[in-house]
């Protein structure tokens, strides 16, 4: 088996083996572009490393060394040589781009002797020692996990003692002093072990570090957020160094062939003169726009533009390129399809179709369905913005508007933000690192002091759809005491600020945001998607406002209308409580009759908004105790209204308490014990449907869904009650309206006996939230407490409540579909759990033959696009 490939031996199709970066370097080499040469250690070598107890086998090591020898001959330099040493960079490169997840090591091969030879050869001792101190810092951080901050602190102290501001002002002697101090830090951190002087030891250490980084906590989190399997592994690219820090005719930069925020055509990027590549990406210094390169180095600019256009034409997609200029000679270090905002992705896809570079099908396949979430992003309310007080501005790194309380660490943001206390949070950092990813995910917005438009914060925030403003150098931040100052204003932890990620403006206070509006390209792309998909898309909604929004976003009806939400309103909750706590059927019916007008009014409003589109109504599902009063004053008021004592009412409430309510007295079990509930709901629904049909002329066919059925006889019992009342209402109103009765498949037993249940049910809708909960045997509300340990120990890679577990729960769905169709070949099949808007789950539902998926209103576009992508991938057509 071959574990190492020279760049010239690979091509773009070998992505799974060489990783994205390695495959692109090979492709660019074969296109004859100026690429520093090197070799790629494959993803299979990474898998072998883990299978081998985290060791690199002798076979792989020998192959690496043999390729290193060939590289020495090609470059005419020797590794570890004291007169003209070969230096290399070591970078990771997985199949899928994982920005900032894996770290780079530059200048590998330097040691105490080689640095002197390097200084002589380049006739630039300052440059040689600068390269060496950077290498010690990176190697210590990435390979040996010595915190970066130790080294930053030494640099800051030295600059302060010399009275200088920039790294570039350090002299040769200063840099030699840094090398000495850095080695001391290494030795102290490594229990007295000296910094490695053998370049081969350095190289093998770096390769192992890249393999190890595939499994660091932030990589695991990123993979979970982006559905990347853990067994893919990462490749390692070893590439001969070129230097952007050799003086004023050298430089380094990052550029995109189109704007990654807006999608506008034209080169967008930035560079630094006399710097190394990681300085731009890590956002340590704030760079110049690429257009200025035309003034600084016109020849390089011309060649750069030619190659950039050639790469975009070759890949037929927007490219993200890293380049270095060494003493006036341009080199490309990598290219990849650029990360972009959802807005930019849609514009680029539509423009490429108009430019005849890709087909409409390719355009639909190119959009990451999950990213459509970002399009529905808030902007500032124009009136509120006019009155806003702008305190500064920086780079608009990721679009959207955000306002929230300031927190200075990722942990605090996580604690207070989304998934924590649920506050609106703005994460403020000197610069973000990949460790901050969970804090960024919990925040409404991110503000950084350092870094450009292509820094870690910018790239990750764009990918998440989080608003980000970066590179605000005027901020003085005191992370220890948790405050920062900007233009004379002081902001402490917990104070509100507002960020505009589209303009880069920073405002004092909490500015009101307004929801997003969608561009014309979105409509074009979605109409192409709808022309390919065969799977229907409905929404989960239980009020006219959500229904209206979902239909605007393309929903074809309602797949789940939860009736219990209609009872929680102030004027209704006392009536439902009265019904629950009544002692006799008569009292219960009396209380329920008071609810009919409310429930009927709700259904009428929904049907009017739907204008003839279908609606599946789920009968009362939650355990009754959820409706009961807990506050003393509510109990007193209800006791008075029901003419009973407070003690009696409390006893009654306690009697309804359940040990395990999610598996208790809920769903169709309520209708079995209290048939009057199902009667009331049927009357309200049928009257509403008949009246709207007569008033507005819509063709309405009510779909009545009985929840939590586990047995055919159970369904028949409730169905008989429903049919009796429905027929009675039809007779009273002299109507011939049709209606369908179906069930939720959410108890595993229902899936196992779906052929029997289909004898009574005219449709199934899979309630995958409960089905997941009951199949795994853990509660959705409590699973979060232990699932993290499952991810860390690689028992699960994904949250089964967010992404359907296709091996277990999915098999129950598949079985129920097959059994249901055996009994009733034309049975309508839907899914209304949260999984209905998750792309990989939608693809699965399409493959097993469901009729439609139903999801929350804002996920409707995601489901439409995912359904189209599933159809295109399978070769199926409308």
Predicted regions, residues:
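Nucleotide/phosphate-binding sheet-loop regions of phosphoryl- and nucleotidyl-transfer enzymes
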Residues: 1-388, 414, 423-426, 433-438, ...
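Short beta->alpha connector loops at strand-helix junctions that form conserved
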Residues: 39, 449-451, 470-473, 561, ...
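Conserved alpha/beta-domain cores
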Residues: 91, 518, 528-878
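Flexible inter-domain linker/hinge segments
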Residues: 207, 214, 376-408, 524-530, ...
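Structural motif
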Residues: 237, 407, 426-428, 447, ...
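Glycine-rich phosphate/ribose-binding loops and adjacent secondary-structure elements
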Residues: 329-331, 433-441, 445-447, 453-460, ...
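Extended, non-globular alpha-helical segments
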Residues: 393-435, 486-524
